[in-house]
Curated annotation (Swiss-Prot):
The lineage of its organism: Bacteria, Pseudomonadati, Pseudomonadota, Betaproteobacteria, Nitrosomonadales. The gene is coq7. Keywords: Cell membrane, Iron, Membrane, Metal-binding, Monooxygenase, Oxidoreductase, Ubiquinone biosynthesis. This is 3-demethoxyubiquinol 3-hydroxylase. Its main location: membrane. The keyword Ubl conjugation does not apply. It comes from Nitrosomonas eutropha (strain DSM 101675 / C91 / Nm57). It is an enzyme of class 1 (oxidoreductase).
Length: 208
């Protein structure tokens, strides 16, 4: 159930996600790999793809926080909080890599965060089965996007590829976690709407 304390925590998390540099406990994947020379076109492509991935992590943070605020089972809420902390590392990795590539984060991050937070709240209100099912499907779709990006990233951009590869592993673990806690399958129409919405986000974030 929502209360003032939870709302304050949620607002604080939003400010940290959108304004503060993200922190990571694990070493950044690929940090010891060489920074191979990229052409201007390759560097721009890598930066755009990493910007999309950063937006995905902003959305994941918002989604997890919204779901955790309305989760009915304490064990589920704690699992969501833990997953959100792990996603913070992805924020740090992609943020750092975007800077290294000379790119910029999406100017629409507040919009992405707000929309995803609202979805998380709604999913949580529907009950933990749907809450976790929505989470599992989200992570599966994110994992698919990351697999696509591994195909599109320049082969010699080994640092970006290392980050995306580890993120893909982590997202698969989060999907498995959601199912293990009781997440149910979503109706096909909902999956289709999620995929359509995700497509709009990725195409927009590629540029802005």
């Amino acid at each position: 159930m929502l209360n003032v304390d939870k709302l304050i925590i949620g607002f604080d998390n939003a400010l940290r996600t959108l304004l503060a540099p993200a922190a990571t406990l694990r070493p950044i994947p690929g940090k010891d790999l060489p920074e191979n020379e990229l052409s201007k076109i390759e560097k721009r492509e890598s930066a755009a793809l990493m910007r999309i991935n950063h937006v995905g992590e902003v959305c994941a943070q918002a989604l997890y926080q919204g779901q955790a605020l309305t989760a009915r089972n304490e064990q589920v809420r704690q699992a969501l909080d833990q997953a959100a902390r792990e996603e913070t590392e992805h924020l740090a990795w992609t943020e750092r890599r975007i800077a290294e590539l000379g790119g910029h984060k999406s100017f629409l991050n507040p919009l992405w965060y707000g929309g995803s937070f609202a979805l998380g709240l709604v999913a949580g209100v529907l009950g933990d089965k749907w809450n976790l099912g929505f989470l599992a499907e989200t992570e599966r779709q994110v994992e698919a996007h990351l697999a696509d990006h591994l195909q599109r990233l320049p082969h010699q951009d080994v640092r970006s590829r290392a980050i995306v590869s580890q993120m893909k592993v982590d997202e698969a673990c989060h999907a498995t976690m959601a199912v293990s806690y009781g997440g149910g399958p979503l109706p096909v129409p909902i999956k289709a709407v999620m995929k359509f919405s995700s497509g709009i986000m990725t195409r927009t974030a590629y540029w802005v």
